[in-house]
């Protein structure tokens, strides 16, 4: 099975940061990305297991994959397509 985390357009390492900093950094990073690009997020804050999926739902980005069984947690987010 191929590793979906291997070729993101950008990587954001939020390890060592605690809520709300990881989600704030994700939001800032995604804002500067093109629609459809993929962001790999590395995190070690347990709150991200709730916050990253909630952020994606609220902002309508796609949470393509998440791996939270071991550290660092990994999340792969696709920026939503532009709306006309």
UniProtKB/Swiss-Prot annotation:
It is found in: Cytoplasm. SUPFAM superfamilies: SirA-like (SSF64307). GO terms for biological process: tRNA wobble position uridine thiolation. The active site is at 19 (cysteine persulfide intermediate). InterPro entries: Sulphur_carrier_TusA, TusA-like, TusA-like_sf. One of its GO terms (cellular component) is cytoplasm. This is Sulfur carrier protein TusA. It comes from Photorhabdus laumondii subsp. laumondii (strain DSM 15139 / CIP 105565 / TT01) (Photorhabdus luminescens subsp. laumondii). The gene is tusA.
């Amino acid at each position: 099975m191929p590793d979906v985390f291997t070729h993101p357009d950008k990587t954001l390492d939020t390890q060592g940061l605690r809520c709300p900093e990881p989600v704030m950094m994700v939001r800032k990073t995604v804002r500067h990305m093109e629609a459809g690009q993929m962001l790999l997020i590395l995190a070690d804050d347990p709150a991200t297991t709730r916050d990253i999926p909630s952020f994606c739902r609220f902002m309508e980005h796609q949470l393509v994959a998440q791996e939270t069984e071991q550290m660092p947690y990994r999340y792969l987010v696709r920026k939503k397509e532009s709306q006309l």
